[in-house]
Every structure is written in structure tokens, then in C-alpha cells.
Amino acid sequence: MSSETTAPMIINEKSSLPVKSEPGQLGNPISDESSEDEQSQIRALEEDQGIYYNEEVVASPKNESDDDIPLRRIQLSHQTSTQQHPEDSEPQEVIDVNDIELPAGEAQPNMERRRSVRFSGRHDEEEDGRNKHFRTPSPESLRYIQALENPMAANGEFEEEFNDLADPQVQPPPMGSPPAYTSADEGPKTPPPRASAGSNMRQESMNELIMRKISDPLQNLIRRASRLEDDSSNDDDDDDDDEDDDYTEDEIAILTYIDAYKTQEVELRPQLRPFTIEYIPAMGDVDLFIKVPRPDEIDDNVGLTQIDEPPSNQSDATIVDMQIRNATKDAAILDDDVPVKLLERADENPDEIKKWISDIKEFHKSKPAQTVHYRTQLPDVETLMQEWPQKLEEVLKTTKIPSAELDVSLEKYVEICLNIVDIPVGKSRIEALHLMFSLLNEFNNSQHFRNLAQNNNLGGETGETMDRLEL
């Protein structure tokens, strides 16, 4: 920036004569050599000539806007240029704010002023260099400041200036799309006509002005907070709108196919194949209720109403209940009713009867042998199973064992049978009979004696007749 740039000069409200100011110096302190009276006399003489020091220029709030930024930029740029080239500085000229031309992009919507606002330059000095001090405000400025501090005492003298302090009515937002969304081909649009400041102002009393000065800062604060909340809530919507605007018509047409697409439903039919079950669950395992549905879609409640077991031969519920009773020692289970097998039309189901008999035999085999303590001393079963002498076996081959056809009483016949098998008879025949039947049971269960009887055939008797004891 060259030294020929015109710097802002001090403009006095009462005098249009320019006063020189030294660049880079804000003010001149009062000299200690002069007394108070001399300084006051000098100030009075200078005020008579129209020279005022430390003048304060009051601007209305509506004029304190972003429109003053270009003026400040010009002022700051000139200060930097004069500081860099102080030797090239020339006498300053008077510049009016209204005569400054702003750039094309910066409009002047708030430049209407009732009073022309003057920006003062650097503080002036006296030519002789003595009694350097700051300028004092003009009497009119002092009265205006006092009226601001105590508006009741002003008696409406500055009522028009106070009306200038009131904020104009808030203009509604412009209609239509924002400038960012308009096409460049449309050309620049002229801004809508703005109403004059005087038409929007209302004549208010001093009390209303005081209340407005108090309430306006609070309203502005609330307005800013609500604007921030609206901006934060609309961020997501604005992003979505921006994303939609980035697509072309062809891309939007392609994106519509996403919603229009429908998947094809393919029904997969299960293929049933025969297989061998690898794992057979045991009794008492937890049923997972993972069942393959029947082809006829009939719910048979497997696992709920009947036991779910893989083998084809299902267990009998009565036999299972008897096994549980035999294994448990719970008194509550033992006190329940004993299960009874019920078979309808037994004459038509002989296989069910045979199965029941075989199940009962297997159940009794699994039961542990009961231990009986006899009152009298009796021989054990192993001793009674010893082989008989050879002479007795030869006699038995020719002589038949007495049958129940003997003309004797039942007690006598029992004693004869017990003596043949070498079982002593005591006071109680029940213990002796229990030992004799236990001996016969051991013979029937012994595979050795069963094979021996089948080989010898013992006079043509078969195994079926050997299992029966005739009394």
C-alpha cells in the first residue's frame, strides 16, 4: 500500500476544518509544567475556535453491524501503511463515511442514519508541542451522554435519538430457495424492497424505552439460543437434502429400482432319506423336544403324552413305573397306587400277554435277592445242591418219588418231601418250605443242571415239565 492512500481525518461536528494529526500516536498527555488554571483557559480558547479534544461519537445500536467492517478495514489498512512509511505520510484529508464506496458484494442495508456518524482519526496536537492532552467531548455530546444516564431528567430533549436506539421490527425470512440451491443461469436477483426505518419506528414513552432497553438484551439472548437449537436440530435434515441434491435425474431413477425390487420366494421341499440312528437316549435324559413332523401333519404329542424312544419296541409304562418304585426309596412314591396293566380284548391279543409275562420275568430277575434270617439252624443252598450218592441215584431210577396221591395229610406229605432233600423240619414248616423252594429255584436257574437234564432226558421228560413242581 503506497503512502498516497488517504487516511481518515478528524471531523468536528461544529467545524469542517481538518486538523493535522501525527500518525501512530493515540493521544498527548497533559504536561506537568502548566497549572490547572492555564489548562482550563487554553481549553476554553480552543473550544471557542472550534477545536475539541477527546470527542466521543455515539452511534446507535442499529448502526453497529457488519456493514461497518469495510470502514474499519480501510482505517486499519491505512494505519499499517503509515506505520510502515511514516516519512512519506502527507497531510490528511477529511473523509465522510457516506462518500466511501463499498465493494459490490457488500450492500448497505443499515446505512440509513438520522445523524451522520463521523469516525475520528488520530488525536491532534498543538503546533508548538506544548500542553499535549486528549480532546474533551463537545457540550452536545456531554448532554447526550447525560440524557442516556438519566433519561427522566432530559424531559424528552433527545426523544428522537432514543427512538433510534430501539431495534426495528424483525424482517421475515426471504421466500424461495436459498442462493446455494438456485441455478447460476437465473442471474442475480434484486433484493426485496425494504421499508424505511422511519415507518417501522413507534413513538414510545420514556418508561417504555427504559423497559425496552432492559428487556432487549434478554430477548436477544433467548433468540440466539433458539437459533442455535434450530440449527443443531436441522443439521441431519440439511445433510439428507444435500445428499439428494447431489444426485442427477438418471441416478435417482436407478435408485428407485432398489425399492421396486422384490425377491423371488423359492420353496425348498425336504427330501426324506432313510438313516440309522447313531445315538439312543437312555432313560432319564432330558427331552429336547426336537421332533421331525409327521408327513400327514398330525401332532401325536411325542414326549408329552407318551415316552419318546427311538427303538420300535416301546417300553411299557407299567413296567417302567415298577422299576422306578424298585429303585427309589421315596415314601411318597411307594404310598401311591400300584399300577395295574389293563389289556382290552385279551383273547384277540395273545402277543401282548406273552410280552407282559416276559417283561415281568425280566423285572424279577433284575431285582436283588432278598436275605431271610431263619430262627432255626438250616443248611445253606450250596450244601443242598451237592451231588447225591451213587446208590441213591440208582434207587431213584427204579423207584418213583411219592406223589400227592398218598393217603396222608398235607403236613405229613410236606415232611416227606423235606426229608428227601435233607432239609430238617423244626417247629415251623414255613422256614423249611422257603429253603426248599429256594433250592428248586437255584436248580432251574443253573445252566449246568439244565443241560444235564436235557442230555439225560430223565425218563423222557422235557424241560417244560421240569419247571413244574407237583404237590
UniProtKB/Swiss-Prot annotation:
Q: Which residues lie within the region annotated Disordered?
A: 1-202, 226-246
Q: Pfam families attached here?
A: IFT46_B_C
What residue spans carry the Acidic residues bias annotation? 89-99, 231-246
Observed phenotype of the null mutant: Shorter and compacted dendritic endings of the amphid and phasmid neurons with an abnormal distribution of the intraflagellar transport protein osm-6 along these ciliated endings. Defective chemotaxis with 78% of mutants exhibiting reduced tracking to the chemoattractant ammonium chloride.
In which compartments does the protein localize?
Answer: Cell projection, Cilium; Cytoplasm, Cytoskeleton, Cilium basal body; Cell projection, Dendrite; Perikaryon
Q: What Gene Ontology terms describe where this protein resides (cellular component)?
A: cilium; cytoplasm; dendrite; intraciliary transport particle B; microtubule organizing center; motile cilium; neuronal cell body; perikaryon
| InterPro entries named in the record | Intraflagellar_transp_cmplxB
Keywords in alphabetical order: Cell projection, Cilium, Cytoplasm, Cytoskeleton, Transport
* Tissue specificity remark: Expressed in the hypodermis and sensory neurons including inner labial, PDE, amphid and phasmid neurons.
List, in alphabetical order, the GO biological process terms annotated in this UniProt record: cilium assembly; intraciliary transport; non-motile cilium assembly
> According to its UniProt record, where is this protein mainly located?
other
Q: What does this protein do?
A: Component of the intraflagellar transport (IFT) complex B required for transport of proteins in the motile cilium. May be required for ciliary entrance and transport of specific ciliary cargo proteins such as che-3 which are related to motility. Required for normal morphology and function of ciliated amphid sensory neurons.
This protein's assembly is summarised as:
Component of the IFT complex B composed of at least che-2, che-13, dyf-1, dyf-3, dyf-6, dyf-11, dyf-13, ift-20, ift-74, ift-81, ifta-2, osm-1, osm-5 and osm-6.
Membership in a protein family: Belongs to the IFT46 family.
Q: What is this protein called?
A: Intraflagellar transport protein 46 homolog
Protein species of origin: Caenorhabditis elegans
Lineage in the entry? Eukaryota, Metazoa, Ecdysozoa, Nematoda, Chromadorea
